[in-house]
Structure formats: structure tokens, C-alpha cells
Amino acid sequence: MVRHSFVIAFFACLLLVCLAPARAQQQAQWIPGQDGLNAGILPDQGLTMANLTINYSADSLKNAKGKSIPVVGTFGFWAIENIVYYVPKTKILGGEFAAQVMLPVANASVTVPRFGFNAGGTGYADTWVQPVMLGWSLKRVNTWVAYAFMAPTGRFAPRSSTNVGCGYWGNDIVSGTTVYLTKNKKTTANLATDWEIHSKKQGTNETPGQAFTIEWGLGQLFPLDKKMTKLLQLGVIGYDQWQVTADGGTYSNGIPASLTPFYSVHAIGVQSDLLVPTENLEFFFKFEPEYLAYSHTQGRTIVFGGSWTWGFPKVRKP
């Protein structure tokens, strides 16, 4: 999973510009905007391969009061996530067992023309592993819970402006829920959550504070033919992400990391999906502009991609 590690360079520049101490604040590892509709639905039994592309761009940085800091610049990244789900036929506690791994590649850049400041990096980023997922399919609800961790496999060096990784481990408690609001299950309410706990950052005395993310969506399904072989899904989605505990340790200049203001960011947007159940195919597009941020960049997130499931062959009864 890719993360906002490149914000460090932007904050380091603002340290010089705004004379504000300790602005090299870490952001959450989980990039919001990846979930939305169908948040509680696990893939069918078998192997599911997905490709998800994220583009985030921002030209505004907000202070602890949500006001714009008067510096002209741009911050953005592209990330390509190659995702594999494995869902065996095994049942645990009456629910489906699943596992997931994400293998990401990222490219990011930060530019502040006034000061001739440019930074960025490209390469393999941090790896997301979700070894345990348990999901249940009820009459009007699909839900799952999982444990995941973020491994610091991306390139990282303290105070470098070309980092692709975050330089620390993350442990995550994750969940997803889809509620069917109508009998025909065409109208849904969705919620995904992620609670992050971080280790100390490599080569420093800093421990980023814990973060909590929710992603939500309200969706409607529309058949595109009488046989229901092609389905269009449209909905309103959004995300909210907060830092929930103070940063730990000290920065390289001796300033306590706990003095850094807590960050948060909030967005609302739209999602469209094309589902082809007979071919086990799904394609999706999401657009979420951020409308509020504190101690964080404010911009917009675009996500698009697709998935395909290879189902296990059915065993014929003799």
C-alpha cells in the first residue's frame, strides 16, 4: 500500500517558509478513497486479481485551524496497486476466510516554484498484507473484519526528499459492512473502517500517532439488460481520516513530536461501477474532492481499476 510519505518534503519546505517547528509530520499510511460501494462484500471463493490506480493532487495546505497556508505549490502522486485475494472453501466461525496482499508502485512530486523547491520519488512502495479476514453473509447485511500490517518495503532514508516508503511498520484493524436497504438488494449503505497503530520510524526517534479512517457510500444498482448479465452501479461516497493519538518521541532538532498538531481530512464524491457477473468482472471509477482539512494537504482523489475472479471448479456429485 502506498502512503503520503512525500508530504514530508512539503512540510520540510514549510518549516523554512513559515518558521513553524516540527512540520515534518507523518500522515496516515492508509490512503483514503480506495473503498466506497460494496465495502462489506468479499470476493467469491477462488483467486481474485485486481488492479487499482490512485491519483491524488493538491495545491493547498491547511494549518491546524483549517486555514490555507500562503505558499503556492503542488503535491501529487500516482500509485498502482496490484492486489490478490485468496478465498478458500474453508469456513471459520460460520463465515468465509480470506487473505489479501497489495503490491504497490508509486510516483510522487512536490513543487514550490517561489523557492525553486522540487522533490519526488518513484519505485516500489510499502507492502500491505492482510493475512486474516473473516466475512459473514446475512439476509440483509454483508460484513467482514480483518487484521493487516504494512511492511516498510519502500525506499526510505530520514530527511530524504525521494522516499517512496514510510520507514515504519503499521498494524491495522480493518472492517467493511454493506447493508441492503431494499428487498431486491439493489440499494445499499456501506461503511469501511481502518485503525492504524505505528512503530518507530527507522533511523529516527519519531513514532507517528495512530490514525482512524472511515469510508462510506450509498449506492443504487441498475440492470443494463433483462438477463442481468451487465449491471451499472452509481453512488455517493466519501471519506474521513483523523489522527487520534499524539506523535511520540522527538524530532532531529530535539523538539517533542507530541507538539505537532493532529491532522484530519474529509471528502465527498461519486462512484460508478460496471459489473459483469457472468464473467466475474468488475470495473470502477471514483472521484472525491476534499472539502475540509486540518494540518494536511487539501485536494482531490481519483481511483479507477478493475478485478477478475477465477472461481474454484465445482465438484460434481456422483
Predicted regions mapped to residue ranges:
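Sec/Tat signal peptide C-region and signal peptidase I cleavage site
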Residues: L19-A24
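Short loop/turn motifs that connect adjacent beta-strands in outer-membrane beta-barrel proteins
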Residues: Q25-Q26, A39-G46, P88-A98, W136-T143, ...
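Surface-exposed strand-loop-strand hairpins of Gram-negative outer-membrane beta-barrel proteins
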Residues: Q26-Q27, Y56-A79, P113-G120
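Outer membrane beta-barrel transmembrane domains
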Residues: Q29, K62, S68, G203-P318
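Residues on the lipid-exposed face of transmembrane beta-strands in outer-membrane beta-barrel proteins
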Residues: A39, N51, N82-P88, V129-W136, ...
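Transmembrane beta-barrel strands of outer-membrane/channel proteins
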Residues: M49-S57, A99-N107, V145-A151, L191-I197, ...
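Residues that define the transmembrane beta-barrel architecture of outer-membrane proteins
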Residues: T74-I80, N118-W128, G165-N171, E206-I214, ...
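Long, hydrophobic/aromatic-enriched structural stretches that serve as scaffold segments
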Residues: F75-S137
